[in-house]
């Protein structure tokens, strides 16, 4: 139980340091991977439970003190919506893959990849006209675009990818570089479809 307490203490520091935007929370969630030893990673289900428990505690602070944490005078309703988006990003994979979490951890040692996309390069390349072949990647791209539509600015693409990698590292294989590129191009395509590209100078 000592390592669970250790996780909890570290997570309290991470999640309560700066909660002014969902993208920062997503970034902190992704950075948790670097805090955990291989032994703790191999206890994926316990880690996920510990994260959810602490997030539930933080949720109260976010919703009840939204104007403090958001820094932009968000209403309680807006804070609740943002909170739901955070949970969706962090835990979308859990239900379908937690049953097999014990068999995939030997792949984790050297598979933590950093996304190389940036705000400057995110929209440089034109997307292909092919329909998305991977529904999980498409859902990740959709969440990014939904955040742009709802909050008027794009989340840090690196942070969204890193959070997704964190959950994948516990329950499966992290996104490969080519998969990250697929998501990037899907985001461009969806933004063009929704006629949001003209507002990019306001988002970044």
Swiss-Prot record:
<dbReference type="GO" id="GO:0030430">
    <property type="term" value="C:host cell cytoplasm"/>
</dbReference>
<keyword id="KW-1048">Host nucleus</keyword>
<keyword id="KW-0946">Virion</keyword>
<comment type="similarity">
    <text>Belongs to the asfivirus phosphoprotein p30 family.</text>
</comment>
<dbReference type="GO" id="GO:0042025">
    <property type="term" value="C:host cell nucleus"/>
</dbReference>
<keyword id="KW-1160">Virus entry into host cell</keyword>
<comment type="function">
    <text>Modifies the subcellular distribution of heterogeneous nuclear ribonucleoprotein K (HNRNPK) and may contribute to modulate HNRNPK functions related to processing and export of mRNAs during ASFV infection. Necessary for virus internalization.</text>
</comment>
<keyword id="KW-0244">Early protein</keyword>
<dbReference type="GO" id="GO:0044423">
    <property type="term" value="C:virion component"/>
</dbReference>
<keyword id="KW-1162">Viral penetration into host cytoplasm</keyword>
<keyword id="KW-0597">Phosphoprotein</keyword>
<keyword id="KW-0945">Host-virus interaction</keyword>
<dbReference type="GO" id="GO:0075509">
    <property type="term" value="P:endocytosis involved in viral entry into host cell"/>
</dbReference>
<keyword id="KW-1164">Virus endocytosis by host</keyword>
<comment type="subunit">
    <text>Oligomer. Interacts with host HNRNPK.</text>
</comment>
<keyword id="KW-1035">Host cytoplasm</keyword>
<protein>
    <recommendedName>
        <fullName>Phosphoprotein p30</fullName>
    </recommendedName>
</protein>
